[in-house]
């Protein structure tokens, strides 16, 4: 099984996180940021990975450190759980409708971290979650997971639906990218993938 866990402690956050890429979508999420908990639960469900996250963060400041540090930790666990990347599809994509919104995620498990994020989120805040933190989370996952990640809200008007669509699309695309391609080879003509 492709699993990994991490305990990460800084002066801003204390994180205990476990990931199973070959799970069933089971999750237990406690970040102290309600909307973010909801998004991570959706991510686990739609990627079919098991994700357990417990965070003690400086949320009295704001949610930035918590959200970014969870992204860093999740990215590191993706790298660790994938190991040598032999036999994975490498690429994944998903379109996700959410009522009036259409979101898209495209992933390359390339070893070359890059994020393109195109989402005009209208509300600056959803509950205790600053909507700009969605981009910070995905950047942290992409950089630390060594993923090329393109995310876009193609259209929509409801900020909750837009961010939810991105998390769900990312989950589906990630599930495809890390799934087996039925071979025992590295998915690169170079014979090498960084990270």
From Swiss-Prot:
Q: Which CDD domains match?
A: IGPD
Q: Which GO terms describe its cellular component?
A: cytoplasm
Reactions performed catalytically: D-erythro-1-(imidazol-4-yl)glycerol 3-phosphate = 3-(imidazol-4-yl)-2-oxopropyl phosphate + H2O
Q: Which GO terms describe its biological process?
A: L-histidine biosynthetic process
Q: Name one Pfam family in it.
A: IGPD
**Which molecular function terms from Gene Ontology are attached?**
imidazoleglycerol-phosphate dehydratase activity
Q: Where in the cell is it found?
A: Cytoplasm
Q: What PROSITE patterns does this protein map onto?
A: IGP_DEHYDRATASE_1 (PS00954), IGP_DEHYDRATASE_2 (PS00955)
Establish whether keyword Cytoplasm is in the entry.
Answer: yes
| Pathway note | Amino-acid biosynthesis; L-histidine biosynthesis; L-histidine from 5-phospho-alpha-D-ribose 1-diphosphate: step 6/9
Q: What is this protein called?
A: Imidazoleglycerol-phosphate dehydratase
